[in-house]
Every structure is written in structure tokens, then in C-alpha cells.
């Protein structure tokens, strides 16, 4: 196996000697390995083009002549042009073109014109190429949405403008669209086509304000759009917080007054963090801010929620959204991983575009679109490589623990460690034992790794050269491929400690500039400083006197894992998370490296995920496949009962387009098939049952139970008799394929409220809950709490339970209470109890 990061574009011009194509030339491009493109022999480039074209269905049996071919890399290997640039420049020069074919788009189902040829000469094309290289090519002009974007826009506009008998219908829509879909541009186009006068954009990433502002200009301030608005006496405006982008146009109150007066079209940008602080929704702001309330009280035509999976269903987010909802307000939620939102929408209210659809479209276009420029060509393919750490390192960090944990492997010494050891010394009567504790205390260095030797060996392993090693830095060639990478770690102190080791390491210190973006541990990059620091070091910033770094490693424990793009990153190293890590968080993180880029004049074609917890990677991939089926299956939404066949089909499609490979201690392993992934997950079925206390609903799925062998059935029965049942129905599934996972420190947190009742009717107040904070949300620091308080008794025989989950740092609203247990008189009915 070898790693591929970039490929080169070869532009070709061909002719077909028949009446239909007389006087016409086809311009296209293919991607080839860089060493082929570097050939200076034109005939070799022509052979490479033919090898690609002859394999395409539409070229079978076609006799053609290649008139011209060249590699599109130019300007000292720093830039490359595309076939699309040539098309646009030819059209700007009024060179006529002719469309000779039809193409049925699999996304929209629409038949469109295709197979574009130009009535020009080779000299015209060479002249255009020369202009492009001189920076005189045609600009991008009006935005042309890709087929899937056009369908998302069309379906959403149609839904919002449709009349429903049910007054609650037609008001909410969800885009389950992967990162890099273009949700901002497409969402703003919805606002434009619907003719909304007032649009509110809510984001959990205030730093992306500039991106929204730029996209606003592309939709609302093009010459054509402005001419149309001015003819109607309207002026489009973009505002944020108090001021408009043009301060002379006024503040929020002035802008909204002008909207109400029919003078302006307003797109207003605000962060969810800003709104939920308001006292108006029970927030913790010290001084009342009237602007927050004014924003929430305004009657918005259209509300777009960016990164909607991040806390929109948490209590604070719900309170904000409830204030924003008015009778005629339409709400569009945007997310690449809305796994926690899918059950809130019907199938007709969701548009889905995932990685599998994207990569299929990329392949389908090349095979069926007659060589026209591929709009998906820039989107890299992902590969996930799961590494099992060397046994030597695992054993050293595990010691007496049952499983390997990143949290333990990267654990740093704290003041608490010193205090605990000192207590042991003070209370130890045995002189020899006391001396051992004192020796251990002498080793303690605050904020340094407990297992520093093991981590240094791990770093050595990453760079250790051998003929079989596939660790990403184990050869000079690999280090060139992975010049800029993103490393995800368990916490701030762990990132700081690793930064110090990397700066001292023989290879990493000499070659790589280390960027610690962990900050204070907050996932938010409120002012964009972390992203700016990364980009400044990768690209250089003369104003800040920061030189360009050819090789960087960015360390983080959560910051920069969602909503941002660093095109130069070619790999992410995952050293945080567990089988409990939500698939949404995992996919958000790994897709940071899929941003398209031109690197040294070559197109970024592939990107990589190096995951050192194979169980977590497989679980996340399988869960993503499950959610993809769930999002597109009405029956699945209602019953949450997905067939194994459909899940396996989608998983097979995913790993075909995003290969998942297993590496045994850094050396070549094997590709996982969909069947193998599901087999591994099935092998831990009993373990999951034990961990969930038999309260996992999927354990009682007839389809699952039918697949158990007689031995597995007996094992399940034996363990159930031994452990009994526990109230953990809402706890996440914990799938551990091997002992290379993370520990409970990163497990999902859940809390409960209990209601005891004399009858099967839910009482109005809970019988016991944890303490409540100033906002009326339960806390978990109640020292007198015990499980006895949530047990049904003869006087109150019925127990109801409600739960809340910690999602992205915020507690969700408590679920509707359900009847959980009923008191039984075991002494009276001993035989029945024994039978049960």
C-alpha cells in the first residue's frame, strides 16, 4: 500500500472525424499520478489520457484523435487551472459552443443538456490557457448550483410555500447534508427565492460570520440581484449584533424598521451563545440586554440554524427557538450530522446528502457526462486506517486495568496525585512501603505524563522507518505527504504535555512546527484566534511577522473539530474518544481533512484518518450507516426498526468510497468489509447486554434474537440470571471490539428524575431529584442521593422515570416520564418471582 495525497490534472483537446462533430473540439480533463504528469514527453501524456478515456462507457467504440494535452500545473508548481476555467473564458470571448447529448441526473431525476463541444481552433484554446495563466481568465460569474444543491433548494422552497391543513406543518425543514455541501449559499438562495424580507441566521460558530457575509454578497448583491431589488425599491442589507456591514445604514432597530416599511431585505447574523445568555430565556447575563430580547421578539420570516445538531435540542436552545417561532416563521436547520434531530422530522421534511451520495455522484459524472467538467472533482476521497498500538505500549499503560484507555495513556500528574501520595506516606507504618511511596512521589512532575516513557516510545514508533511500517511519519515520503496534520487529544493538559515532548523529539522537533490549539479546552473558537494561528503558520502572515512553515502539527482537544476548514490538512490522528463517542462528533472531526485544496499545483485527491481506537472507528462508521438509512426511511422513523440488509448495503457503499483498513501494530493489515464490521459488532452483543443491564431495547429486537446461536442464547440467559435488570434504558451502547478504546471519563452523561405514585397516573411533581441550579436545571452534586430513593414501595408501588442527556456541554430537556417499575410483594408471590 502507498499513500496518495494529490493527483495532477491533464487538460486534453480531442476531435472526432465525422459529420456530427465537424469543426468542433471537446475540452476535458483527467486526473493521473503526479509522476506521469511530470513527463515532458507529450506522447506519454496522451497515452495517459487515452487510458482513462477508453475505460469510460461513453467512449467505447469511438474513434477519436487527441489534438492537444498538457498538465495544468503552472506558476512554479503553485497553481493549477481547470477545464471549467477554459470553458468560462471561451464563453466570455463569445466562442460558440454546441451541446450534443442528454444526461439524466440521478439526484434530481431531470434530463439535462450535456456533451459540450466548442467551435474553435487549437490556437484559440492555447490563447485562452495563456490568458488564464496570466490571471486574465474569466471570473466565476453567477453561481451555478450543483444538482444536489438545486434539489435541496427546490424541495425546501416548495415545502415552505405549500399549504397544509395542519397549521403546524410546513414550518420546519432539515438539511442532513455533509460538510462541504455548501449549506450557507444554498440556504441563502432559499431565502431569496421565497422572497423573505427578514432572515435570521443562528450559528454555534460566531467565527464563521465572514463566510456567511461573503455568501450573502454572492446571492443578494450580484449586479443582477441588485438591479431586481432596486427596481422594487428594496436594498439588501446584512447585519450582525448591533451594526450593519455598512455602519451608515444603521443598527438592528433601524434595519428592522426599514424592513417593516418595505425598504430593505435583511439578513441578520447572530450566535446561539449570545441569545441563550439573555435573561429573557433564563440566561445568566448579569445586566439585561434589550437587543437579545428584541432579536427574539422580532417576527422573522425565515430562521436558519447552522450546525443545528449542537445543542438546539438542549434546554437553553429550546427556550431560544420557542421565542423565535412565530405564526408565519419558517425554520431551516442545517447540519452535517443531525443524528440527534432525525426523529423530530418526517421524511418529507428532510433533505439528505451524505458522503456516499457525493462520491457516487463524482464517479457517475465521469462515467456518463461525456467529459464535461466534473463539479465534484475537487472533493477528496477519505480513507480510515485503524491502528492497534504495539502490545508493549498497551501493556505498559494498562497495568492492572481491564482495557487500554487514551485517558489513562495520556494522563498527566496533578496536584491531587501529590496529595494522595503524601497521605499514603503520612499514614503508612511500614518503613519499606513508605520508602516506595516516597520514591513514587519523587517521580511526580505536575502537568507531565504519568506514562511518559510509553508515549515517547509511541512517538518513536510513528517515525520508525521500516519496509513494512505504515505509520504516517515512518519515512521521508510519508512525511512529505503528511506535511500538515491535525492531532486530537483527550484534554488541554495532555495537549500541553505532548507539545513539550514533540518539541524535544529527535524527528518531530527538527521537522515540524507544533501548534497547540487546545486553548482553555472550550470547543468554541470565539474570536477565531485558534484558526487564525493555524492558517498564519501554514501560509505565513507578513503583517504579523509570521513565516510560512512547511510542516506543522496542530494539537487540539476539541477546538477546530467542527465548522472550520484548513485545506492544507491531509490527515487527522484520533487519540481521543471511545466507543461511546457520538458518531456525529466523530464524523464532524474527521471531515475536517476533506476540504478541497490545490497543494503545490496538484489537486488534493485523498485524505486520511489515522485512528488508534479501532472499536470507536468501526462503531462510528456503522452508526453513520444506520443513521443514513434511518434518515431516508419513513418506516424506520416511525418504528426505529431497520433491516440489517439495508444497513449493510449502505455500510458497504460507504467503505467502498471511504475504505476502512485495519493495521496490525502499524503494519499492513486488511480492508474491512461491511460483513466483517457487523460480525465484529455482533461478537460483542453479550458484552453490550451486560453493560446495559439488559435494559437496551435492541436486546429484545426479534430480528436480533433470531440471529443468536444456541450457545449465545444460553450465555445471555446465564448472565441475566446472575446480574438481574438495571434501569439503564437510555444509556448509550458501549461496543468494544478490542482493548484499544477509551475509558469512562469521556462517556456520555445522563441523569434521571424519579416520580413515585400510588396509581398508574403520573404525579404532578417528582418524589426526588438532584439539586436544581439558578436556571431550574437539575445538578448532580447531591451527597444524600441514593438508589433507595428511586425504588417503588408498597405505599407508592409505581415508579416513573424521566432522563436528560449532556449534549455538547448542555443538558437536554427532560424526556416525558415513562412507567419504569412496579412494586411486587415477593414474599407473597415467591413462586411467581422465582419463575420470572
Predicted regions, residues:
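Non-catalytic accessory segments flanking enzymatic or RNA/DNA-binding domains
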Residues: 1-147, 800
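Conserved RecA-like P-loop NTPase helicase motor core
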Residues: 28, 514-636
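Long, largely alpha-helical accessory region at the distal end of helicase-like NTP-driven motors
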Residues: 120, 124-141, 423-450, 454-457, ...
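Walker A/P-loop
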Residues: 165-190
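Conserved Walker A/P-loop ATP-binding site and its immediately adjacent core
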Residues: 184-189, 193-227, 273-274, 489-496
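SF2 helicase catalytic motif II
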Residues: 272-274, 291-332
